[in-house]
């Protein structure tokens, strides 16, 4: 399927390059191996050839004598402070016992994700921080933005009835298209990249498709079947689809934000967030460009779209805010404490011993994953 995509994309003057993955191809130490396509990557890496916080950060720190205590099934409620307003630690909920405990520390580092870190800070009110910890600028939760997303899936008749073999390769996509155009000639800002999915990879969670819907492409009206008939159709069509996804950059807006809901708490009694987020014309026009590009590429490769092209009434298939889970901006960094929450080192302007090290401080997320995922 990648070869068909490359052919179709290049015909539309869309660049295609190998995808960038955090997977080792050369040995860097004795703790992690190199990828040799040994197993299903979705089930975790047996040789620690890929990046994960556990195998690459926590385990090495423990082995080198680092003092790390892991509190599993625990959720931070607030950052605790003293009379001077400095952080003294955190209060957290043991979700198994449904009890609240406190931990003391000289420095508090939050990495709960953009929205959850904002929630913790906003819930950490005190006499010294009546608007939430580190929120003298009133910007915690503001400028929330996510990647744009749009998709199209197609059927490639050329790929049916193939011999079944393993096309897994390295886990994740193998090729993709970075942004390739000049925005000065377009009606929207920023851009997006294209991800490519498909092939005969080993089935994983969520695998499945409506076999009967493929028969219509060959004028077959049968309703499918069970046993041998179903198995035959599955083998016939498996690996003959290709998915194309666009992931783009949205423009940060102060009017897009999360805040503490004054009327709702979770089952542990902790106030939850509520969201105010609307796409602008910029993102909607970007989504239209995605769909037009996908349609052209699929036509070039001889594919048949599996669903209708979304129109203006559906924002051209633009995914809902939050769907791509690339949230950034809620604790934005900057030099001016009145216009930002953290400094260039992701430390709160208001509290010198609290850091936010997730994607919250990023003022923009380009069209890439803001952190390792």
Where are these regions (language model features)?
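Glycine-rich loop(s) and the adjacent beta-strand/alpha-helix scaffold that form part
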Residues: 47, 62-67, 74, 78-84, ...
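A short acidic-Thr-Gly-centered motif at the start of a beta-strand
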Residues: 57-63, 95-102, 333, 339-349
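A glycine-rich dinucleotide-binding beta-alpha-beta segment and adjacent secondary-structure elements
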Residues: 18-19, 34-41, 71, 77-80, ...
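Non-transmembrane alpha-helical segments in soluble domains
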Residues: 6, 58, 62, 121-122, ...
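A conserved FAD-binding loop/helix module that cradles the flavin
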Residues: 364-373
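Patatin-like phospholipase A catalytic core
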Residues: 1-33, 207-228, 234-238, 288-290, ...
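Conserved redox-cofactor binding core of oxidoreductases
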Residues: 1-75, 320-323
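FAD cofactor-binding and catalytic pocket of flavoenzymes
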Residues: 137-273, 278-281, 324-328, 349, ...
């Amino acid at each position: 399927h990648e070869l068909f995509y490359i052919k179709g994309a290049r015909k539309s003057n869309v660049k295609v390059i190998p995808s960038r993955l955090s997977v080792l191809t050369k040995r860097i130490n004795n703790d992690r191996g190199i990828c040799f396509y040994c197993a299903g990557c979705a089930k975790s890496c047996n040789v620690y050839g890929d990046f994960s916080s556990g195998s690459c950060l926590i385990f090495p720190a423990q082995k080198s004598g680092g003092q790390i205590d892991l509190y599993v099934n625990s959720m931070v409620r607030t950052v605790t402070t003293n009379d001077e307003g400095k952080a003294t630690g955190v209060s957290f909920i043991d979700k198994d016992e449904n009890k609240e405990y406190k931990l003391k520390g000289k420095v508090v580092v939050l990495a709960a994700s953009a929205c959850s870190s904002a929630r913790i800070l906003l819930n950490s009110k005190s006499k010294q921080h009546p608007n939430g910890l580190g929120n003298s600028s009133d910007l915690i939760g503001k400028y929330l933005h996510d990647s744009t997303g749009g998709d199209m899936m197609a059927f490639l008749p050329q790929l049916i009835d193939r011999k079944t073999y393993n096309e897994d390769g390295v886990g994740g996509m193998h090729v993709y298209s970075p942004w390739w155009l000049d925005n000065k000639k377009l009606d929207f800002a920023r851009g997006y990249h294209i991800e490519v999915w498909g092939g005969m990879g080993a089935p994983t969670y969520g695998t499945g498709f409506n076999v009967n819907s493929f028969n219509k492409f060959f004028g077959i009206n049968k309703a499918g079947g069970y046993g041998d008939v179903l198995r035959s159709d599955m083998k016939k069509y498996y690996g003959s689809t290709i998915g194309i996804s666009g992931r783009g950059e949205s423009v940060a807006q102060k009017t897009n934000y999360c805040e503490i809901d004054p009327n709702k708490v979770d089952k542990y009694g902790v106030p939850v967030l509520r969201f105010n987020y609307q796409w602008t014309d910029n993102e909607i026009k970007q989504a239209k460009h995605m769909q037009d590009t996908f349609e052209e590429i699929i036509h070039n490769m001889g594919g048949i779209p599996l669903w209708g092209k979304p129109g203006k009434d559906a924002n051209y298939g633009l995914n809902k805010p939050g769907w791509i889970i690339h949230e950034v901006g809620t604790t934005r960094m900057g030099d001016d404490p009145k216009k930002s929450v953290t400094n260039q080192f992701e430390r709160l302007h208001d509290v010198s011993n609290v850091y936010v090290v997730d994607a919250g401080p990023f003022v923009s997320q380009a069209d890439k994953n803001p952190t390792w995922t």
